[in-house]
Amino acid sequence: MVDVKTIIEESQEKMDMAVMYLEEALAHIRAGKASTRLLDGIRVDSYGSMVPISNVAAVTTPDARSITIKPWDKSMFRVIEKAIIDSDLGIMPENNGEIIRIGIPPLTEERRKQLAKQCKAEGETAKVSIRNARRDGIDALKKAVKDGLAEDEQKNAEAKLQKVHDKYIAKIEEMLAEKDKEIMTV
């Protein structure tokens, strides 16, 4: 016989994954202040394999408006600089031979709106994933009824699943509101 608790836990795991995905996606959307996580998505070629910049250099934020990158291998300066220029972050690195400095310019009103829109799109993707997890859970419960699960147990489990769903949707809304506030703050 199918365990209702397992079905709910599996759905909850899928919902957790959607929230973790959103956290990661929102971390890469710049909000006007310097953050080392801004560069996490940029990969560079290091001895034949693509690795994050943080694997080949020390990445720090000396102040709220700049990021410094100090490559451990001098040959990586050009590679890192090119990768940053080629990224869609809209930032220009300055290479002085010792460190690469990235000035984070203040965001324009238009760019802030674009970023807020991008956040909403990422949030919508996460919400769809959560709804799909709920749907999969409900489908598994309906199948369990055919395998001998009592209908009132199914209804109770669906109600629990809906509560879990609502909790995750609220968490996503909260994350989006926080990021939107961060982006729109001048």
From Swiss-Prot:
What Gene3D superfamilies does this protein map onto? 3.30.1360.40, Ribosome-recycling factor (1.10.132.20)
Q: What does this protein do?
A: Responsible for the release of ribosomes from messenger RNA at the termination of protein biosynthesis. May increase the efficiency of translation by recycling ribosomes from one round of translation to another.
Cited Pfam families = RRF (PF01765)
Please give an example of a GO cellular component term from this record.
Answer: cytoplasm
In terms of CDD domains, this protein maps to: RRF (cd00520)
Q: Which SUPFAM superfamilies match?
A: Ribosome recycling factor, RRF
Keywords recorded for this protein, A-Z:
Cytoplasm, Protein biosynthesis
What name does this protein carry?
Ribosome-recycling factor
Q: Which family does it belong to?
A: Belongs to the RRF family.
The record's listing under InterPro entries reads: Ribosome_recyc_fac, Ribosome_recyc_fac_dom, RRF_sf
Cellular compartment(s)? Cytoplasm
Organism source for this protein?
Bacteroides fragilis (strain ATCC 25285 / DSM 2151 / CCUG 4856 / JCM 11019 / LMG 10263 / NCTC 9343 / Onslow / VPI 2553 / EN-2)
| Example GO BP | translational termination
- NCBIfam families per the UniProt record, alphabetical: frr
* GO terms assigned for molecular function: ribosomal large subunit binding
